[in-house]
Amino acid sequence: MKNYYSNGKLLLTGEYLVLDGAKSLAIPTKFGQDLVVENIQEPQIIWGSFTHTGACWFEAVFDLQKLRLVNCTFNSDREGNGEVIAETLLDILEEAKKMNPSFLKSENGFMVKTNLTFPRNWGLGTSSTLINSIAAWAKVDAFKLLWNSFKGSGYDIACAQNDTPVFYQIENKKPVVAPVKFNPSFKENLFFVHLNQKQDSKEGIAKFREHLDCARHDIQQKIKRISEISDAFLKVESLEKFEALIVEHEQIISSIIKLKPVKEKLFPDYFGAIKSLGAWGGDFVLVTGNADTPTYFKNKGFTTILRYQEMVL
């Protein structure tokens, strides 16, 4: 039996612009997903994916020699159907095999189980943790596997592989990962609130590209400023200055993607600062506040609220 574990992810700075070289601050979470592989006699891959509660949400059987789907079961009303997920999984396995032809080269088969430690709709990296663990199993580069089978910046792979916050940047089409120390003195005033509106990363990237074409004239200046804000996140000593950085960051991204910042859109009467994390419009937001913060958001109908220490690895 082999066990592979990958951390979940949150992108604190540089959403969208990380794709064009901005230095971004990413943090691994205490939540993640493991992948357990056992050898079996049948020449098949028997796959089972389990939620954080232990419920099986996806099952599939693949013919090992031909790498073809035999059958699948999808026990969820979210995000597509079983065959789509099975084909996506098959694409990842096939790409890993192209990268390492000895992967899955066996007369015997495999029983594979994946186990999430967070709800699937949290957006902490159900796909990225899977890709990173498959890459470890196949002994291939996880960033290349991501880029060959999906799209995305790769910051989530950096989080999957590191147990500390990282600066993540794409330079000359290659990932540059630098572990950093991000331990703000005001972390007691930081919260993560889930908006319960799962965002599609591919769709978010596509929309960003559309808007980017219209904003090319000053995009390099904005990338430079976002990189500076990422640096400033590590050095800022007061909550007030941190909030000012959040507001500026939100304004810069808003000017590019032509969407209202989340505070302006949903919480204009909130007393603290709010920052979108990743694709705007869903999943978690970073919130500054105090002891009254959980009550405010619960009264608005947002009940999944985690303190900084509960989320960050």
Name what the model sees in each region:
Residues 29, 124-126, 162:
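Short glycine/proline-enriched turns and hinge-like loops at secondary-structure junctions
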